[in-house]
Amino acid sequence: MFNFLFNSSNQRKINSYAPIVKKINALEIEMQDLPDKVLRAKSVQFKSRLQNGENLDDILVEAFAVVREAGLRVLGLRVFDVQMMGAIILHQGKIAEMKTGEGKTLVATLAGYLNALSGEGVHVVTVNDYLAKRDSEWVGQIHKFLGLSVGLIQQALPKVERKLAYQCDVTYVTNSELGFDYLKDNMVLSMSEIVQNKFAFCIIDEVDSILIDEARTPLIISGPSEAPIEKYSRTKLLANILSKDVHYEVDEKARNIILTEQGTLFCEEYLSINNLYDLENPWVQYILNAIKARELFTKDVHYIIRDKEVVIVDEFTGRIMSGRRWSDGLHQAIEAKEDVVIQQENQTYASITYQNFFLLYPKLSGMTGTAKTEESELDKIYNLEVICVPTHKPLRRKEFPDLVYSNEYRKWEAIADECYDMYRVGRPTLVGTTSVEKSELLSKLLNQYKIPHSLLNAKPENVEKESDIIAQAGRQSSVTIATNMAGRGTDIILGGNPSYIAKSILVDLLIGKSSVKNNYKLQQLSPNTKISLNNILNALETDLHSVDFSMLEMEKKISIACEQVLTDDKLEIQLRKAYQMIFEEFETIFSKEREYVSQAGGLHVIGTERHESRRIDNQLRGRAGRQGDPGSSRFFLSVDDNLLRIFGGNKIADLMQALNVDNDTPMESTLLSKSLEAAQKKVEAYFYDTRKQVFEYDQVLNSQRQAIYAERRRILESSYPRDCVLQYAESTIDDIITFWLTSKENPEKFVNLNIKIKYLLNAADTFSISKDLYKDSEELKKWIIEQVRINYDLREAYLEQIKPGLIRQLEKYYLLQQIDNAWKDHLQKMGALRDSIGWRSYGQQDPLVEYKNEAFNLFIEMITHVKHTVVYAILRSRLMMKND
């Protein structure tokens, strides 16, 4: 029935969805006959049925049939059977693996709509702001047509609008914005500042990128700390005179530095100190970071210099990560290395990994083109099953064997030759590189070949054109160089993307203020079309000047004009005429190119290096052969590539030498392919172990985080925080008495209980505990607690006279302030513990067990500290004291 090969287990699951899809299809004609008003009213009926006891599975068939019809009316897109299957998988809280171009964005609307009917809100998560905005404006129209509200979270969105967006039925948001909002919500001082609602259902687009690639990187909210900047400058000079394999060793697999005993002694002598590991004056972390900056972090690969600042390049997407900084002093070490201004080191205020963040959702699902290779990890950590969905049309992509060269430069020459061959026959080519540096090297080679090409990497001048470049990467003879998966989410359509270019022209003309005459994209259009377009825009001038539209409002109007959604807005109707005019002419131009490019063999994808994960390689291959188009892919490698060098290059180099392969001849064999796959599996296993270890250690901190955040929320929601303060007071008095009883046994540490309690209560000099009470510790405790309550009542009455309700505000403020300060310090201690715990393995101890034990002790210390400081801060506050 389907044109895709699956293992029997996966196929059985797919077959089980066929009867449900058949029922949905049976309703198609009935839905087509319904007027818009009646179709919209279905949402109200579904909600009513849910309130009357039915569940989501009971209404799934009819709800999906409604969304399919709405999509056809609003966007002109009909949901295919395989897309229905993908949506059922999402609704069941699983991962749907769907190939590039199979319409994942549309699939999410079905599961999103169904689950939003429960009234609990659905979060659709994408990897960047552009995709979140595109999806909310495009497929979000289906939800709006059916009466649901659609929210969009963008990076600079103000708090009030952010809160409203989260209250919508369906909210489109990036993973980072979602995670940071969660952390910020757990740092607020009043309930009104919280923007997020209770988590219910989440659909993650490109789920593998977020749950696996970014799993090792925690989300961190930080502020300035007091770390001395001069240490970075001194250790930079020190690192430059240290010798590799003498003073330190480099573990490239773990991306770590190990100081040798000789190195430790040399550093101590150079710095004139006795102990690198002294907790009062630590130097070791600064030295290790300085060496890491030199050995493991390369300019234009891991970061770029922009405006005299070090800016991180995302190793998975090739995009720059503005505003993100490496933690634990690493960023400062790289700034010292590059001789730019060293910015103050930050202290962590709040943090969470994506692993633990997304596990907060009771129901989680995702979609991607590549997840099957990581299904074991997704199942073990997230309890997410991966199901491969068959393609709508047969896959026609040819995957040519890898070519391996004995040196790197010959590899790049061969890639340039391949680009030239494709350019000559008119086939579009997409070249995936692993860094800015490599993409620019290839660009220089192509310039020597006089091959016109587009360059897409993390450099700021290229980033802005990302979607434009990718959208037109399927045109005849086009050559596009892109770092990793830049442009992921934008389809490469053979011959070019007429709808994208038509919309981008309207944006240029109306928001970018370019003219019809000067817009380079319009050069291919006929003179008559240009004149007609100019006339429409001139007629719109009056409307545009009469109303002062914001850029956001103008973008919304353009989005509506470019889709099939019904509108009676005069401006949108005129914009639609302009869009149709541009679209139709480009469609004519592009359709001829599409036919030529298809016959020539379609898009050719070139990989320039095998990634650490087979999944990332598959993502690159997946750009070709979308929706049954022809296409091909090939990887060009050399024994100098990082993966082969670190994880098995010697075997391959020896094999090439044994076969007497010269520098110019590439090697291609089954044995070689097996060696490459073995190397990748080795890396995947290594990084899985790393992520698993991160998860296991973070689980310890996560349980503590949940306890602290729950206590914070309890205080925030409380209208009477006095109870909490008095609970803390009882606990504090208990600790004081226990300490006093212990001290009685040791004359050197004896504590005067009377002085302690007098100080706590801020009592008069005449305060005295009766000698009889000392005989019974329980009675003593009850009496002191009673004194605290009496004392508290008097001070509360005094404050109520000054301002009613002031005491409650003070209590809440002190409670939250002390919890936040203690948690901040606790995170620092936990970080230090995590960094040092690995050494325990040398003493035949399990580092994780030791970490759990010590983390528990630190947590108890922190809780005790919070209770004590809150009680002392409130009882001894000047505001709480009456001036007699």
From Swiss-Prot:
Which CDD domains does the UniProt entry name for this protein?
DEXDc_SecA, SF2_C_secA
The GO terms this record gives for MF are: ATP binding; protein-exporting ATPase activity
This protein's major location comes to: plastid
Question: What's its EC?
Answer: 7.4.2.8
User: Domain of life here?
Assistant: Eukaryota
Pfam families in the cross-refs: P-loop_SecA (PF21090), SecA_DEAD (PF07517), SecA_PP_bind (PF01043), SecA_SW (PF07516)
Instruction: Name its cellular compartments.
Output: Plastid, Chloroplast stroma; Plastid, Chloroplast thylakoid membrane
- List UniProt keywords, sorted A-Z: ATP-binding, Chloroplast, Membrane, Nucleotide-binding, Plastid, Protein transport, Thylakoid, Translocase, Translocation, Transport
Which PROSITE patterns does this UniProt record tie to the protein? SECA (PS01312), SECA_MOTOR_DEAD (PS51196)
Q: Which reactions is this enzyme annotated as catalysing?
A: ATP + H2O + cellular proteinSide 1 = ADP + phosphate + cellular proteinSide 2
An example GO CC term for this entry is: chloroplast thylakoid membrane
**Residues given in the record as ATP binding sites:** 83, 101-105, 491
* Signal peptide feature range: none
An example GO biological process term is: protein import
Membrane topology of this protein: Peripheral membrane protein
Q: Does the keyword Translocase apply?
A: yes
Q: Which family does it belong to?
A: Belongs to the SecA family.
HAMAP family, alphabetically? SecA
PANTHER family, sorted: CHLOROPLAST PROTEIN-TRANSPORTING ATPASE (PTHR30612:SF0), SECA INNER MEMBRANE COMPONENT OF SEC PROTEIN SECRETION SYSTEM (PTHR30612)
Its biological purpose is as follows: Has a central role in coupling the hydrolysis of ATP to the transfer of proteins across the thylakoid membrane.
The protein here is known as Protein translocase subunit SecA
| Gene of this entry | secA
